[in-house]
Amino acid sequence: MALLQISEPGLSAAPHQRRLAAGIDLGTTNSLVATVRSGQAETLPDHEGRHLLPSVVHYQQQGHTVGYAARDNAAQDTANTISSVKRMMGRSLADIQARYPHLPYRFKASVNGLPMIDTAAGLLNPVRVSADILKALAARASESLSGELDGVVITVPAYFDDAQRQGTKDAARLAGLHVLRLLNEPTAAAIAYGLDSGKEGVIAVYDLGGGTFDISILRLSRGVFEVLATGGDSALGGDDFDHLLADYIREQAGIADRSDNRVQRELLDAAITAKIALSDADTVRVNVAGWQGEITREQFNDLISALVKRTLLACRRALKDAGVEPQDVLEVVMVGGSTRVPLVRERVGEFFGRTPLTAIDPDKVVAIGAAIQADILVGNKPDSEMLLLDVIPLSLGLETMGGLVEKVIPRNTTIPVARAQDFTTFKDGQTAMSIHVMQGERELVQDCRSLARFALRGIPPLPAGGAHIRVTFQVDADGLLSVTAMEKSTGVEASIQVKPSYGLTDSEIASMIKDSMSFAEQDVKARMLAEQKVEAARVLESLTGALTADAALLSAAERQCIDDAAAHLSAVAQGDDVDAIEQAIKNVDKQTQEFAARRMDQSVRRALKGHSVDEV
């Protein structure tokens, strides 16, 4: 159905033209780029078959290098070799210097206090450095896919704030990339394992990289990942494992001199090689600086046990912040190369009471999840799987009195979008309002899809129609709907989040649209009838209150006429004759006009009592 062939604005709408999209894991230590080919997500290697790209840029007057070549210059030209720039993203110079006092770069502050790094290529900010890394990844993807990228999904830590996320977007734009979306790294990892379409519940993402450890506790509900808590240790990672093992080898080899950088490098290289080998073997032989010996996995485990315990303490804190227990976690996803260490997997499994997910390469899992998301957003999914991600596929609205649906955001509205409407109370003294969020094209609640319900409480007890409640619908770029209801005079509010596309197939969307057309005339008549019945109920409710308060203003004959008109309205309101109800409402209005005028006069006299003409 052509209506459902929705693409990202600015992209070709050719139904059979596959668009080129990529997922980018812009990491602190290493970065990757991935794509979906023949239905499979895979990371893209360089000419030498290396999938990881070190997140390092070396700047010179005549240009710059990125990746392995740049990393090789780190020791000789420290000031011009920028690494771990992700730590600086979105931070002020003062913040960076307080957090990382030993960085070897020459910093200068810009007029707004943001950091500038003084290099041989001039003053550069973290956005520019990140852009150079992104350009290198994009070039790898374009060459591998034989074409320019139509869009990318870039992953960011779940704890990144708005400034850090905006900095990442700015870097992508500077690199000439169209950002389809920023995706939280733990969410990307969960998507890679297909958990977004699995059982609802709590998911833990344990991310142990080279230099940092992050733990994220997510809740999957109706297709939406909610970040419940994040934690970790920014100064703990696989590099610490390497240094502990290198120091152990030094002791075994009897090397006392720590000033020889060549020996230091040799020891560290030997430690890294041994660590990797011990993931599969129980024993590994080491030959370094003229010393030969054996290291067992048990010895290595003893060295790193305290560090692994530190990660589990961070996990416990994150679970406490999230308000859940380890046994509440459905799945544990392992991310980061250091999670290959058997002791890490063993201890994590013991802590959560379940075997962690490790089938996907932990170095690649985040990039793979981003690639899957990018493939969906760019419009490459077949018709049977495609959902409308860039427009509202079905109207969103609220249930109002009489079982009617008041549409707030119409179908085919481009997202992100926000719309608001004002509503009021139906009864005198009403202090709460039930908000029922609906989806669909029909006029009555019974014919639409219920999305969510919540209540707004604390409304001041005013006469019917006296309180004003603003209901705001906001749909973000991910298709996530937030509905907020706020009483204007007090500011009390309540809200809920839901993903309208969750559980919907294209055929269901098409069927709902078709039904709205087929039953259009019938629905309009049903709405008109319901509206008249609601108005009749409102008139009778208001009249009952007025008679209770001021019946003394009427003669017996006048009261009888009003009672007869009200009884007639009450009777016809039970039927299905719209015109009869409308005429009965008009008759009640006619019979009560004099009564209303007397009530108004009485109210004015009461208001003026005790005041002189001059005061008025």
Curated annotation (Swiss-Prot):
Gene3D superfamilies (UniProt xref): 1.20.1270.10, 3.30.420.40, Actin, Chain A, domain 4, Substrate Binding Domain Of DNAk, Chain A, domain 1
Keyword Nucleotide-binding: yes
Biological process terms in GO annotation: iron-sulfur cluster assembly
Listed GO MF terms: ATP binding; ATP hydrolysis activity; ATP-dependent protein folding chaperone; unfolded protein binding
Protein family according to the UniProt entry: Belongs to the heat shock protein 70 family.
PANTHER family found in the cross-reference section: HEAT SHOCK PROTEIN 70KDA
Record HAMAP family: HscA
Name of the protein in its database record: Chaperone protein HscA
Organism: Salmonella paratyphi A (strain AKU_12601)
Gene coding for it: hscA
